[in-house]
Design a protein with these regions (language model features):
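Short, structured motif recognition centered on aromatic/hydrophobic residues
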Residues: 7-14, 23-24, 47, 52-58, ...
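A low-complexity, Ser/Thr/Gly/Pro-enriched, surface-exposed linker/loop concept
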Residues: 62-66
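Vicinal oxygen chelate
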Residues: 1, 14-29, 36, 43-50, 55, 74-153
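Amide-forming acyltransferase catalytic core, primarily the GNAT-like/NAT-type
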Residues: 5, 33-39, 44, 97
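Regulatory and interaction patches adjacent to catalytic/ligand-binding sites
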Residues: 71
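N-terminal beta-strand motif that seeds the catalytic metal site of vicinal oxygen chelate
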Residues: 1-21, 77-84, 134-153
Length: 153
């Protein structure tokens, strides 16, 4: 069975959110979230473009070692990941794994569940699979979820 999926957002690794933000503002983007994640060593800002497009800027926290510092050192700023919202992450993972696609790093976080399809499985692109839980909308509001509702609702 084909999983219920839609593009949620594109994540862009930057040295500085402040340096990346002016272009987004010129294009009419509205910042929905700006949050620091000390546990993972990065700050992220989430933007809405139109009513169905989202971009995320990811900036490393100074002095913190994280996935993002390694990424920026190896590749420089640019596309980090494409996030696909899924209605059922476990079902989606099962479908992919049955077809031989490797899925890694399944994690339950506050507000969402996530897993990743590594670039080696997806033409060089890191795909984040994300299933929102109720807490995400409570914390960040309906605009943080495309169309104000989670996929499959």
């Amino acid at each position: 069975m084909t999983p219920l999926v839609r593009v949620d957002h594109i994540g862009i690794a930057v040295e500085s959110i402040a340096d990346g933000e002016p272009l987004l503002e010129l294009l009419g983007a509205e910042k929905l979230v700006h949050k620091r994640d000390d546990d993972q060593g990065f700050t992220w800002a989430y933007y809405e473009l139109g009513n169905a497009s989202r971009l995320e800027l990811l900036e490393p926290i100074d002095g913190a070692e994280s996935f993002l510092t390694g990424f920026l050192e190896a590749r420089g700023p640019g596309l980090h990941h494409v996030t696909l919202e899924v209605a059922d992450i476990e079902g989606t993972m099962a479908v992919l794994e049955e077809e031989g696609v490797r899925v890694i790093d399944y994690t339950e976080r506050d507000g969402y569940l996530e897993a990743f399809v590594p670039p080696s499985e997806a033409a060089g692109v890191l795909f984040q699979l994300m299933e929102y839980t109720g807490d995400f909308q409570v914390e960040f509001g309906d605009k943080a979820v495309i169309g104000g509702s989670r996929l499959g609702e």
